[in-house]
């Protein structure tokens, strides 16, 4: 199939084998059910190799660094398993489970290949340069700025790009598909542990995947009430692009880029809690995969090995999604406070202190490894020392406000306005009704002193408290919606197993009602997923990448001067194709630097060289307009690729110039 034509299969299989076998050997020190160990080993190996790659790539060429990370993962597993009886003699391979996992990962990857939605303009540019050695990454649109962002999944994808020769657009989809499939299986493992039922495990995985917002329930309201509600809200973002009012947009298509053959109905979306069927952003489902691994492994190992593995997973979580990491740590604080209040003593139990090395170690690594927390730390050092030589891209700040829920589509929804309650329920979805069962589970976990899982449950508290905050940083106000939506993901982890146990001895009528509730909660996700399936046979690159760009990528990626800047009238295209940075602004999207516009409107090879650009990546219309500006002998034409129609007419063209000698 076409996916295999986009990458080298043997290096990919070898890389996955290093991760899986290394992680499997490490887990010899953990008491795990046989059916869990293989896939947990793959996830652990993937995670450990990513963090090792994040370290080794700072000193070595990425090809060597990435292979070394995989080999080190295997060697660590061999060393840790050696003092015990090697588990080879007890080797069990649940073939059916592995086949189902591989099929699911492949299926999800194919869907991703047919879609280009959510931040590809941001992630593919960064991924392309990371695969060539920009680790820790710098902002692709101005490399003077540190890219203080959650780039764990991009690290995984960068290994696919460099070692398996997958172009960024395929590597990103493969990384998302792989980690999402692991997330769903881990969710099933958790449910099976709680219920002992394979049926509950399968239902829980489906619930985790499909459940999200339930905006369609607004259509159940009387038209007069819906009209009043619509008049009380102001759409923002893609919501405003999709319609003039809430009442009107419910009948419209959702206007977002990168869709497949069929548009998405707006009523199936959510600006607060989209289902995992829409996990096409730069972090995918990687943070949930890591949280589930922490929960499944905590308490299953002993001594320093367990602490080291948990510290690695927690550090990776910080690099995957800083919000999830911060809320997990805050949840641990809330869980401890509940324990202190319950026992009326500040003398904390030994079971809590036993996890201190992992929690503290993960936090220290998070501050040093790169990403958001490293950016915050460098920002503090810069303020104290009066220097901003390592300026971070994102600034974090908050202000207090009256209780409000922020939807990335519907805007601000006040809890003081009863009309907004209907919209809040529609944006959060029906999983919110599991809240009492989840807190009851948290109380039980505290009694049992299962601290890291209790931390996950009580991480709902800081998430819920964000209704009193307004995000005033420079990542956009809707960054707050991810924080508020966090508690809903906690609920989705537990909804099926907790309700399964509660309803097991109840009447069939209640059980059928719960099944109906689950189907209603999953309706939007099922609808969106069904519209994504037709995209599978039609792979795309990205909204800004054409087939001719993919050919230029094959010819020139990784073959130009490292660290050089590229100029392209489409700032995201040149960096993705060539793996280089540009210098166009401090935001994604249209350039913000006036000097960039001056060069674009009046190109001169000498001025471009003085501005720091060595390479120019030019499209057909721009080349036709300004070709005579590049007649100087100092300009070297590295490539002039054209596509022609049957009548000989040029339909697409890319010209790659080197102006490094224009001084």
What are these regions (language model features)?
Residues 87-95, 297-306, 341-353, 434-461, ...:
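Membrane-interface helix-loop-helix junctions at transmembrane boundaries of multi-pass membrane enzymes
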Residues 503-663:
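Extracytoplasmic
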Residues 177-180, 326-332, 475-504:
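Hydrophobic/aromatic-rich transmembrane helices and adjacent perimembrane loops
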Residues 60-110, 198-205, 356, 663:
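Start-transfer (signal-anchor) and selected internal transmembrane alpha helices
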Residues 272-273, 294, 306-322:
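Membrane-interface alpha helices of multi-pass inner-membrane proteins
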Residues 288-298, 331-332, 336-343, 356, ...:
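Hydrophobic, aromatic-rich transmembrane alpha-helices
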Residues 1-85:
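Membrane-embedded, hydrophobic transmembrane alpha-helices
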């Amino acid at each position: 199939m076409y996916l295999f034509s986009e990458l080298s299969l043997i290096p990919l299989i070898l890389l996955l084998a290093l991760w899986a076998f290394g992680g499997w050997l490490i887990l010899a020190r953990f008491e795990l059910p046989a059916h869990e160990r293989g896939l947990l080993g793959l996830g652990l190996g993937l995670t450990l190799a990513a963090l090792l790659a994040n370290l080794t790539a700072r000193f070595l060429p990425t090809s060597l660094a990435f292979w070394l990370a995989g080999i080190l993962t295997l060697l660590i597993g061999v060393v840790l398993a050696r003092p015990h009886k090697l588990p080879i003699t007890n080797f069990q391979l649940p073939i059916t489970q592995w086949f189902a996992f591989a099929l699911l990962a492949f299926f999800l990857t194919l869907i991703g290949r047919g879609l280009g939605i959510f931040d590809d303009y941001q992630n593919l540019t960064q991924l392309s340069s990371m695969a060539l050695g920009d680790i820790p990454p710098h902002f692709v649109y101005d490399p003077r700025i540190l890219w203080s962002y959650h780039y764990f999944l991009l690290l995984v994808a960068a290994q696919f790009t460099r070692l398996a020769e997958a172009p960024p657009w395929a590597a990103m989809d493969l990384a998302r598909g792989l980690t999402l499939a692991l997330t769903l299986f881990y969710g099933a493992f958790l449910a099976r542990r709680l219920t002992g039922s394979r049926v509950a495990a399968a239902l829980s995985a489906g619930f985790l995947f499909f459940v999200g917002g339930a905006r369609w329930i607004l259509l159940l309201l009387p038209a007069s009430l819906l009209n009043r509600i619509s008049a009380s809200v102001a759409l923002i973002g893609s919501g405003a692009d999709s319609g003039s009012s809430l009442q009107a947009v419910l009948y419209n298509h959702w206007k977002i880029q990168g869709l497949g053959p069929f548009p998405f109905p707006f009523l199936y979306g959510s600006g607060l809690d989209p289902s995992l069927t829409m996990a096409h952003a730069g972090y995918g489902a990687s943070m949930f995969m890591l949280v589930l691994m922490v929960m499944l492994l905590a308490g299953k190992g002993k001594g320093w090995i367990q602490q080291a593995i948990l510290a690695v997973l927690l550090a990776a979580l910080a690099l995957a999604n800083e919000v999830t990491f911060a809320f997990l740590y805050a949840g641990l604080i809330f869980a401890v406070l509940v324990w202190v209040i319950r026992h009326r003593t500040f003398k904390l139990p030994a079971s809590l202190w036993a996890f201190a090395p992992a929690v503290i170690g993960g936090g220290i690594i998070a501050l040093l490894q790169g990403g958001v927390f490293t950016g915050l730390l460098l920002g503090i050092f810069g303020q104290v020392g009066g220097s901003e030589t390592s300026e971070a891209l994102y600034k974090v700040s908050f202000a207090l406000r009256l209780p409000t829920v922020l939807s990335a589509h519907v805007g601000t929804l006040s809890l003081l306005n009863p009309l907004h309650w209907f919209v809040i329920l529609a944006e959060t979805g029906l999983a919110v009704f599991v809240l009492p069962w989840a807190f009851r589970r948290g109380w039980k976990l505290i009694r049992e002193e299962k601290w890291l899982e209790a931390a996950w449950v009580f991480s709902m508290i800081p998430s819920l408290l964000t209704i009193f905050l307004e995000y005033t940083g420079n990542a956009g106000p809707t960054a707050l919606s991810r924080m508020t939506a966090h508690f809903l993901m906690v609920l989705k982890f537990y909804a099926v197993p907790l309700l399964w146990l509660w309803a097991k001895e109840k009447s069939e009528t209640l059980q059928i009602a719960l099944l109906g509730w689950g189907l209603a909660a999953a309706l939007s996700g099922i609808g969106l997923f069904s519209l994504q399936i037709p995209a599978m046979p039609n792979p795309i690159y990205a909204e800004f990448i054409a087939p001719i760009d993919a050919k230029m990528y094959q010819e020139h990626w990784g073959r130009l001067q490292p660290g050089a800047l590229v100029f392209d009238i489409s700032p995201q295209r040149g960096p993705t194709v060539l793996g280089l940075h540009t210098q166009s602004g401090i935001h994604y999207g249209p350039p913000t630097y006036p000097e960039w516009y001056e060069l674009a409107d009046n190109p001169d090879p000498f001025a471009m060289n003085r501005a720091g650009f060595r390479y120019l990546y030019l499209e057909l219309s721009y080349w036709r307009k300004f070709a005579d500006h590049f007649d100087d002998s100092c300009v070297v034409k590295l490539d002039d690729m054209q596509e022609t129609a049957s009548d000989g007419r040029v339909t697409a063209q890319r010209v790659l110039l080197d102006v490094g000698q224009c001084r």
